[in-house]
Amino acid sequence: MSEDLGSVCSVKGDRITFFLNKRVNLTFGQIVRVDSKNNQSFYARVVNAESRSTLETGEQLREAEGKETFGPYSSYKNIDAVLFLEMNHGRVRSPTFNPNYMDKVVSLNKEDSRLLRLEGQLVMGVVRSGGQTLDNVGISIDALPRMIGMFGMTGSGKTNTELMLNAQLIDNSPRTAGLIFDFAGQLLDGKEIGGKGLSNHPLFHNKVGFYSAKEERLRIGLRTLVPLKLSTLFPGIGYPQYRLANELYKKLGSRWIEEAREVYVVKGQKGIAELAGYSNRTVIEALMSRLLGLGTVLFPASDYSFVDNVVQNISKGITCLIDISGITSEEQHHIVCLTATGVANHYKRMWEKRYEQWQKLPTLLITLEEAHEFLDPNRPKTIFSAIALTYRKYRVGLNAVTPRPSRINPDVFAELWTKMIMKTELKADRDYLTKNAPYLEYSDTEIKMLDIGEALLISEPKIRFAVPVRITHYLEYLDKKEKVDYNLPSSKTLEALDENLERLQSISKDSNARA
């Protein structure tokens, strides 16, 4: 049931102002419906509110001091809202005109949610309407390759939003899969965000692959690094260094990095010059400095690469969570870029050479925390710029997560068709969002005042306006999920295990006595 909020008092272009009824709750960003004539309605978002008085200044002062009381019409509140949709005889589209003076303004109901088609397969939360919540709101699977951005200051609820989105990818496997780079090590166990993470998802054991530097599962053998991969490993590397690497590779084969490092340690720059037939000292020292910086833990002398296992898992619809906390920022950069390149290029090759098999691959979303470090226009370009700009047709999507949207390359930002905007306090970032994101021209105040767990959701072309959303708390989501029965045999009791241990120890003692 819709609540009567007030009536229109003025209209200009796409902005309306309406009187707010007494004792009505309203919030910045709330969506309201304006019922007009001829079975026509308009939808608008609240962007500003003002309290005013009809009294003269002297009368206001006397009223403030309690010396005089005036009637109920001595003060009023008017609300500014921006039109974004029109409904005419059941058909919803962008506004072709605007409402009339004194048209009624009402709150949304569940029927409005249905007409606005806000629920996608990947449910993120519920629509906020004043102090109430309405139907579910979500992102469609088709929106994943159109790229996503999650923006908000630290503590605004980004990690919870990441968990919710990736949990939905797991739920929709094998149709969808995720590649998640966790910089802070929070997503597995939910550290500092409630104590539950993706490891608590009912499908974790058969739908998620976990890789961590702490468990030494992030290994990329030096013999898998051909010269072509150097631009991925070291963005901004010059052509002369690549040419030198290619000469070393031709002479030494797959062990070129190991043997070149040995020669350089023993003979220095002259040894490399003789080996490659290349005498530029500056180029040799620059390349060898980079190669010597590859640590033996992450880059052992072998032909094994965990990236191959990641590609295999994702191809089967298994989401891969890569914990890169606890290693240096440079090592994080290496792991992230090499892994994302390997997976994205697999999708590209399949599309080009095995189209029928490509059609069976899950739609992929790569979640990249600290995205501004990889998408800054003032830094060398990485694979993530290419993914955002050109990999849509391969069904590879990027989820750029960052507290600093203003540091993202504008060309990349324009390709993020789905945006989840949480509380943002830095004015530079709010200005960037309101100037570069559609439907947010008047939303600076609203973005600043969002509460923890609240967001504005835009997901073109399905959701062509900013929807006020309360993101579902991940712990609540887990509570509602059914446990999965893996049909495993029941565990033995501790007493039975102790008896077996005593029996084995007794047998061992008898054996030693005979010996």
Give residue spans per PLM region.
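Helical/strand "switch-coupling" subdomains that flank nucleotide/phosphate-binding cores, especially
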Residues: L203-Y304, I314-T319
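Glycine-rich phosphate-binding loop of nucleotide-binding enzymes
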Residues: G120-S212, P410, Y439, L457, ...
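Substrate-engagement module of ASCE P-loop NTPases
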Residues: L169-D171, G342-K348, E352, F384-N399
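Loop/turn-to-beta-strand initiation segments
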Residues: R175-L179, K316-T319, L361-L365, Y394-N399
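Conserved helicase/translocase P-loop NTPase motor core
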Residues: F299-L364, L375-N378, T382
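Conserved ATP-driven motor cores of ASCE-family P-loop NTPases powering translocation/secretion/packaging/pilus
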Residues: A388-A466
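Conserved P-loop NTPase motor module
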Residues: H334, D451-A515
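Basic- and hydrophobic-enriched, low-structure N-terminal and domain-boundary segments
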Residues: M1-M153, N160-T161, L165, N172, ...
